[in-house]
């Protein structure tokens, strides 16, 4: 098992009787003959002030203390002569830093130059829209050439070959608007992998900006899922998953009550901002972290509440340790 036990477990077991299961690791990883534990950060060079922050976070997690928050209140910025380190920014200055980083030539030449990281999907949705439409000026359509995407699951073609791979980054290579035979409005696109430059086969993404189109999509997927749920044919689930693999979505979709209100998770999304969980395993030169979104959450009544301290520190540890050079935090 290769893992850092102070970060977010890759796989957790679900127990409906327990409220806090974010740190309950699957027995798949704990009941093994050989285990390897990561205890040293290896992304940053010696002398990077980030390393001291990581040490404080690790100590807090081990000892149940909260020294990290006091430290960043007293040390708003620590940067070495190479420009490596961390900076705590207010809301206005953080926004300007995001604009500066994502509009720079460094980002256009190197997609791993910077990434924005937060905890909730809503926050990531806000920042993806802000960066794409406000910074990069791509508001003319839902998908345009050179848009950046991150895959949220691996999708296969009918021959079991992967079209897109979970967590990989892509750039839109070609795009055209298309009305499918079933009447659904889609974007037919090919993507260029940011990893190896290979171009994917063409595939379809549902136009979710069109509410009528999404209603039609909902009617279809609910009907197909209900047949799979209640039917007896051996191929019923194959037809459902084949429909999903042909019609990809950029937004989560909730099935109706007849289908037990199950959530159909999105397949792909803009990749300028990603969640802490999605970032795990990735490496970027710089990260912009919405620390407010990690420390606090909002109840359905609109009340702002502190997140579980240990959970927040684990999320923050993952987000900050993605950077090889500099972390900018909004607080």
Predicted regions and their residues:
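Structural recognition of the conserved hydrophobic beta-strand(s) that form the central parallel beta-sheet
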Residues: 1-4, 37-38, 329
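Conserved helicase motor core of P-loop NTPases
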Residues: 6-166, 173-227
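Substrate-engagement module of ASCE P-loop NTPases
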Residues: 1, 5, 25-30, 315-320
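Short beta-strand/turn micro-motifs composed of small residues
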Residues: 3-4, 118, 291, 331
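Hydrophobic beta-strand signal
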Residues: 150, 171, 285-288
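Helical mechanochemical/support elements of P-loop NTPase systems and associated helical scaffolds
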Residues: 1, 34, 46-53, 123, ...
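C-terminal accessory regions
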Residues: 185-331
């Amino acid at each position: 098992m290769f893992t850092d036990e102070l970060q977010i477990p890759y796989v957790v077991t679900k127990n409906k009787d327990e409220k806090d299961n974010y740190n309950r690791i699957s027995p798949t990883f704990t009941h093994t003959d050989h285990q390897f534990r990561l205890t040293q950060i290896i992304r940053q060079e010696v002398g990077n002030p980030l390393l001291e922050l990581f040490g404080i976070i690790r100590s807090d997690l081990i000892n149940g203390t909260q020294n990290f928050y006091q430290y960043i209140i007293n040390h708003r910025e620590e940067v070495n002569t190479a420009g490596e380190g961390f900076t705590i920014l207010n809301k206005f200055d953080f926004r300007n830093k995001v604009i500066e980083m994502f509009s720079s030539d460094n980002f256009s030449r190197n997609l791993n130059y910077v990434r924005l990281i937060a905890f909730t999907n809503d926050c990531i949705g806000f920042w993806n829209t802000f960066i794409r439409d406000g910074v990069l000026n791509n508001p003319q359509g839902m998908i345009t050439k050179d848009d950046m995407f991150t895959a949220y699951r691996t999708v296969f073609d009918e021959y079991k070959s992967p079209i897109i791979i979970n967590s990989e980054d892509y750039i839109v290579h070609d795009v055209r608007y298309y009305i499918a035979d079933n009447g659904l409005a889609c974007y037919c696109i090919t993507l260029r992998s940011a990893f190896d430059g290979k171009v994917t086969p063409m595939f379809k993404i549902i136009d979710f900006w069109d509410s009528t189109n999404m209603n039609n999509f909902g009617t279809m997927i609910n009907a197909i899922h209900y047949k799979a749920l209640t039917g007896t044919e051996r191929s019923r689930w194959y037809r459902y998953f084949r429909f999903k693999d042909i019609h990809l979505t950029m937004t989560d979709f909730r099935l109706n009550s007849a289908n037990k209100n199950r959530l159909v998770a999105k397949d792909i999304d803009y990749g300028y901002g990603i969640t802490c969980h999605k970032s795990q395993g990735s490496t970027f030169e710089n990260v912009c972290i919405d620390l407010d979104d990690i420390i606090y959450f909002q109840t359905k009544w609109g009340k702002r509440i502190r997140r579980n301290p240990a959970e927040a520190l684990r999320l923050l540890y993952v987000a900050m340790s993605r950077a090889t050079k500099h972390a900018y935090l909004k607080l």
